[in-house]
Curated annotation (Swiss-Prot):
Phylogenetic lineage: Bacteria, Pseudomonadati, Pseudomonadota, Gammaproteobacteria, Pseudomonadales
InterPro entries documented for this protein: LolA/LolB/LppX, OM_lipoprot_LolB
GO terms for biological process, alphabetical: lipoprotein localization to outer membrane; protein transport
Location of this chain's protein in the cell: Cell outer membrane
Keywords on record: Cell outer membrane, Chaperone, Lipoprotein, Membrane, Palmitate, Protein transport, Signal, Transport
Lipid-modified residues, S-diacylglycerol cysteine kind: C18
Protein family per UniProt: Belongs to the LolB family.
The keyword Chloroplast is annotated on this UniProt entry: no
NCBIfam families tied to this protein: lolB
Protein purpose: Plays a critical role in the incorporation of lipoproteins in the outer membrane after they are released by the LolA protein.
The encoding gene: lolB
Protein's recorded name: Outer-membrane lipoprotein LolB
Signal sequence extent: 1-17
Native organism: Pseudomonas entomophila (strain L48)
Length: 205
């Protein structure tokens, strides 16, 4: 079950890509809206990164933790998850129009989109969409969001499409202030992400 939740976590990351932003935002909190807009503009141009970290998942009948590697190069992604004590591993690679999932001891699966792969392999229909934005500390651009800013005009809390994201700490890397620790709360599932190493890149278009 933990591996299934890990696969779900990776799939959440892949729909929005690195397109422009323009969501309908309701902003509150301590921060300065103008500084937030400047921060958002900078991060929206960040279209490449490498992340190493840990992920923890808690669900009604299952919980666990594992390691995360995430390589993003514009619309190409390579996301790898490994469970504790080597119990299982999954690798998801692809770009728009083609996705491949490799699961240890289970095989290789392909689909046209992450959503299709999730439904085909796990039988779940979930709002697979926004983590590629959320991991940068941004709301996804194509739906309404409620934002709470911290005293540094960065996201402290985000509510969007039935999910709540809490930003617990940030780290500065290569001139970018990026989330270091965040918690995601969805329907019957909680995810904690701790980034141990951020390597951001602006690759251009």
């Amino acid at each position: 079950m933990f591996l299934r939740h890990c696969i779900t976590f990776t799939l959440i990351a892949l729909l929005a890509g690195c397109a422009g932003f323009g969501s309908k935002e309701a902003v509150q909190g301590q921060g300065n809206p103008q500084l937030w807009r400047q921060h958002k503009q900078q991060l929206s141009g960040l279209d490449g990164w490498q992340i190493n970290g840990k992920v923890g998942i808690r669900a009604p009948r299952d919980s666990g933790s594992g390691t995360l590697f995430w390589l993003q190069r514009q619309d190409y992604y390579d996301i790898r998850l490994a469970g504790p004590l080597g119990r299982g591993a999954a690798r998801l690679t692809g770009r728009p129009g083609g996705v491949m999932l490799e699961v240890a001891n289970q095989g290789r699966f392909e689909a046209d989109s992450p959503e299709a792969l999730l439904e085909e392999q796990l039988g779940w229909r979930l709002p697979v969409s926004h983590l590629v934005w959320w991991v940068r500390g941004l709301p996804a651009p194509d739906s309404k969001s409620q934002l709470t800013l911290d005293g540094d005009s960065r996201l402290a809390r985000l509510t969007q499409d039935g999910w709540q994201v809490e930003y617990l700490s940030y780290i500065e890397q290569n001139g970018y202030w990026l989330p270091e620790r965040l918690k995601l709360h969805g329907e019957n599932i909680d995810v904690t992400l701790v980034v141990k190493d951020w390597q951001p890149r602006q690759l251009g278009h």
